[in-house]
Amino acid sequence: MTSYAITAVASSKVNLHLGVGNARDDGYHELVTVFQSLSLHDTITVTPAADDMHDAEDQGIVATLSVSGDSAQAVPTDATNLAWQAAEKMYQAHRRNGGAPAKRVHIAIDKGIPVAGGMAGGSADAAATLAAMAQYLGNTNTEQEILSIAAELGSDVPFTYLGDTRLGTGRGEQLVPVLSRGTYHWALAFSAQGLSTPEVFRKIDQMDRQPHLDVTALNAALITGDPHKVAAHLHNDLQAAALSLRPELRTILEQGRAAGALAGIVSGSGPTCAFLCEDAETAQAVAAELSVHYRTAVATGPVRGAHVKGH
């Protein structure tokens, strides 16, 4: 066990392609998606709870959890938080593997990823907690065990743990690497109010639509490293549902393209709008133009997934 704070980076994501098939018996939808990990991130710090005298065997490994940064008040600080659940599952696996009892921890989350914004902020926090707890517990769990825990926590957690550019199938948790050249530059526009992922999926189930499940052209474009070619193949089946629930997103997409973006797309279930740009300068210009009316940021991808700082 360590006696010092461990800080991990929780990278956000954008879906370059999100094809949504039919609902399964378990309530999930069959997905074909291409994820790209972005530099916009949260940070997770795991610290031994020095003043906590309770036994992790009886009370659980997490003593307390706090949240700071963007929209911190909207993030739960109890066991409903995925980061809390990630820590508990890691500790349980550690003990099953014969690991020694550990001192309870405090988890501090500093938010940079928008809450309920379609960029997997909660999943990324869980993934980074897995990385931090692995080090805290002495790395007694294998990578495959950690990925299995990630899949139990949520569909986006395995990708946010691994990062880079990957094809996701099943409910998004079955991942294979995608060859991608170059760095892609994004301008991001955030909405003041989040969108519920289940609500967006319920809406799409009510719509007459044809799923887009072929990513051949996008994968070929990614190999070239040409943002113009990639922009031509960005697609999100959930976008129509998100626009139906939040019609103002259509205006944001139009404004971003008019400001110079190559293409704009609703990120995941929304409401964040992501604009692929030709270069860093254009991304800055698009973000600046949109910042008159919205909160914005710039990001690059692909980047590493969850990792402990300095490792």
UniProtKB/Swiss-Prot annotation:
Keywords, alphabetical: ATP-binding, Isoprene biosynthesis, Kinase, Nucleotide-binding, Transferase
Recorded GO MF terms: 4-(cytidine 5'-diphospho)-2-C-methyl-D-erythritol kinase activity; ATP binding
Residues that bind ATP: 114-124
UniProt catalytic activity: 4-CDP-2-C-methyl-D-erythritol + ATP = 4-CDP-2-C-methyl-D-erythritol 2-phosphate + ADP + H(+)
Known pathway: Isoprenoid biosynthesis; isopentenyl diphosphate biosynthesis via DXP pathway; isopentenyl diphosphate from 1-deoxy-D-xylulose 5-phosphate: step 3/6
Highest taxon in the source lineage: Bacteria
Entry-linked InterPro entries: GHMP_kinase_C_dom (IPR013750), GHMP_kinase_C_sf (IPR036554), GHMP_kinase_N_dom (IPR006204), IspE (IPR004424), Ribosomal_Su5_D2-typ_SF (IPR020568), Ribsml_uS5_D2-typ_fold_subgr (IPR014721)
Active site: 13, 156
Biological processes per GO annotation: isopentenyl diphosphate biosynthetic process, methylerythritol 4-phosphate pathway; terpenoid biosynthetic process
Gene3D superfamilies reported for this sequence: 3.30.230.10, GHMP kinase, C-terminal domain
EC number, as in UniProt: 2.7.1.148
Function statement: Catalyzes the phosphorylation of the position 2 hydroxy group of 4-diphosphocytidyl-2C-methyl-D-erythritol.
Family: Belongs to the GHMP kinase family. IspE subfamily.
Name of the molecule in the record: 4-diphosphocytidyl-2-C-methyl-D-erythritol kinase
Originating organism: Corynebacterium diphtheriae (strain ATCC 700971 / NCTC 13129 / Biotype gravis)
Primary gene name: ispE
